């Protein structure tokens, strides 16, 4: 459960990330595809090479959705309901992939915003990303 301090920490990190959603999103996906190559199976139609327009576009889409979650941090279930439906019922993404994505995003934030990602902020961001993953997998059967 996110407490008031966690929410403030997540919003503070997001203020630094928001201006870089395409760059950080693409880097997060590229890192995930490299470290967890099995995740590529969900993107058979994508050019998965470094810097591809499709990865940049999808990375931006992923982090824009994450930004919406930050903006609705007190009601993640409503904010992510449509995404949860799509990932569970249409795309049928294995829930473990959200953990992979979350880990890769944390690494990207640590690389680009090391002064912001204190141990306390790291914990808050990890809790937030876990909460997002829980909501996104809530409609799986």
From Swiss-Prot:
Keyword tRNA-binding appears in the UniProt entry: no
Residue stretches in coiled coil: none
Keywords of the record: Heme, Iron, Metal-binding, Oxygen transport, Transport
Subunit structure: Heterotetramer of two alpha chains and two beta chains.
UniProt superkingdom: Eukaryota
All copies of domain Globin, residue ranges: 1-141
Function: Involved in oxygen transport from the lung to the various peripheral tissues.
Taxonomic source organism: Chrysemys picta bellii (Western painted turtle)
Chain sites annotated for binding O2: 58
Tagged with keyword Metal-binding: yes
A Pfam family matched in the record: Globin
Protein name: Hemoglobin subunit alpha-A
Chain sites annotated for binding heme b: 87
Molecular-function annotations in GO: haptoglobin binding; heme binding; iron ion binding; organic acid binding; oxygen binding; oxygen carrier activity; peroxidase activity
